[in-house]
């Protein structure tokens, strides 16, 4: 069996910059049309993988979400992701379809900032209502459910259907 070899710094840089260089030359969709398609895909799904990290600690957790008011909302009892969230609010979440071939790719990577919403605040109650979680059920819990709010900064969406519109399959939406 061959030994694992590491890449040089230059090789890591080249690999890391691959999509930046390719995207600079790509055919882009109109940002309004892209935003509409991105939001349709987000709303058509409800499960993501949320990656959190701080120092050498990394965690990636499958979670259910809702999306409204241009943010992702995730209720969570707890878990190790909170070790990282205490120290680093930068997160990445991904939503993707089952792989069925290159002509049928759909998935997105969302880079954003997480915050923890105060339990039973107006924002918390609204998110519970949107998710159809009865407030009385939340109030009866021995410990309040945590609510993670993620404000996207950038959404990178790979969708093979974009080629039908004359654009490249990988598009980036910069969020404000």
Regions found by a protein language model. Name each.
Residues 1-29, 105-176:
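Charged, gly/pro-rich active-site loop segments
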Residues 79-80, 121:
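Serine-centered coil/turn micro-motif
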Residues 27-47:
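Short, basic/aromatic recognition patches
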Residues 31-35, 78, 132-133:
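Charged, amphipathic alpha-helical segments
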């Amino acid at each position: 069996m061959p030994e694992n070899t590491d890449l040089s710094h230059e090789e890591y840089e080249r690999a890391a910059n691959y999509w930046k260089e390719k995207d600079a030359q790509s055919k882009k969709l109109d940002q309004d049309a892209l935003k509409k398609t991105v939001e349709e895909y987000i709303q058509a799904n409800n499960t993501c993988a949320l990656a959190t990290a701080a120092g050498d600690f990394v965690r990636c957790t499958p979670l259910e979400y809702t999306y409204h008011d241009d943010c992702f909302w995730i209720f969570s009892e707890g878990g190790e992701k909170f070790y990282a969230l205490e120290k680093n609010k930068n997160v990445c979440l991904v939503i993707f379809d089952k792989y069925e071939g290159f002509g049928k790719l759909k998935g997105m990577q969302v880079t954003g900032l997480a915050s923890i919403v105060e339990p039973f605040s107006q924002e918390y109650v609204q998110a519970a209502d949107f998710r159809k979680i009865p407030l009385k059920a939340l109030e009866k819990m021995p410990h309040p459910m945590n609510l993670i709010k993620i404000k996207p900064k950038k959404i990178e969406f790979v969708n093979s259907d974009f080629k039908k519109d004359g654009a490249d399959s990988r598009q980036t939406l910069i969020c404000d």
